[in-house]
Amino acid sequence: MGAATYNNYNVSLTHYHRISERFAFSTGGFYEHTGGFFENAARNNEKVDRSNAGGGRFRGVYIPTSNLKVDINLNYEYSDQGGYPYYYTGITPSAIAKAKENGKEMTEDRADYIGKISYNDRSSYRRGLLNSGVNIEYQANNFILSAVTGYQHLNDRMFLDQDFTERDIFNIEQKQRANTISEEIVLKAKPGKRWQWATGAFGFYQWLHTTGPVLFKEEGVKSVIENNANSAFEEVSAKPGAPTMGMTVYLSLIHI
């Protein structure tokens, strides 16, 4: 158990137990909380990077005979983290110089937000991770045969305010589910033999599903999609003989 400044604390517990000469196990769990350092001005100075994490593990060893051992491992961890404490740095000198080259004047219209973290949607990363494995070892008179089977499951979600401003423009929610199965078989000579040799095989299979839709909100639909499209149409319409064109979007939310 521990505690620190900025509202950080953690606790963990582990137990070891030997039931018999043939079976023993250990198990444990933990929880961690981080209060965070950075504040978001657009969300009442809410901590951007606070986080919570917890998990548990189990290991069991079974020896049914003198030459056979089974080792089982299971571990799970869940975390929910805030993050991405990006802040506005202002218009760069290079951008101002480039605008002047193109005959345009660029002025700072967001001076009040320089150096401040200020975005309206809470950005975060959430993850659940499961790892498990079984190791079976058989000792014959002249060799040792071991087989290790592993499985991993990952389920995570990243939510990001992509405009990183106090305006309600657009965000992304990326979800991922990944599964991996692996197998390793090793055949080797026993220690102390004149000839030491080893051979084996390894293989794995993984399948992954990812989604990452971008959500344009009402202000984003207007400023990013509709206004940009109409600016392009104005340039086309300014050419001699070109038709007058325009676009109006009636949807307040658009998933892409």
Where do the PLM segments sit?
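Outer-membrane beta-barrel translocator/receptor signature
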Residues: M1-N40, E46-G56, N67-L68, G128-L130, ...
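Feature marks flexible
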Residues: E101-Y119, F204, H209-A242
